[in-house]
Curated annotation (Swiss-Prot):
Compartments, as annotated in UniProt: Secreted
Domain of life: Eukaryota
GO molecular function, one term: toxin activity
Main location: secreted
Disulfide-bonded cysteines: 46-61, 52-63, 58-72
Keyword terms of this UniProt record: Cleavage on pair of basic residues, Disulfide bond, Neurotoxin, Secreted, Signal, Toxin
Designated name of the protein: Conotoxin Cl9.2
Signal peptide (residue range): 1-18
UniProt tissue specificity: Expressed by the venom duct.
One Gene Ontology CC term in the entry: extracellular region
Residues that make up the propeptide removed upon maturation: 19-41
Keyword flag Amino-acid biosynthesis: no
UniProt domain comment: The cysteine framework is IX (C-C-C-C-C-C).
Amino acid sequence: MSKLVILAVLVLLPLVTAEHGRDEQAMQPEKKTMWTLWSLTRRGECDGKKDCITNDDCTGCLCSDFGSYRKCA
């Protein structure tokens, strides 16, 4: 009987974890969409177009790395 219970757990465990993984993957596009909507609402020097060296060069945002450039975002 105990072997049957262990076998059932071993069979059902991957199914439960696979469903959990699908839920996490389904939520990622929403996060990306929200990030895109948020970045589109940025105006002024915080839109990623103004060059900067330190955070003091940006008003209301941070100086961030974009590839080999630093921009206010």
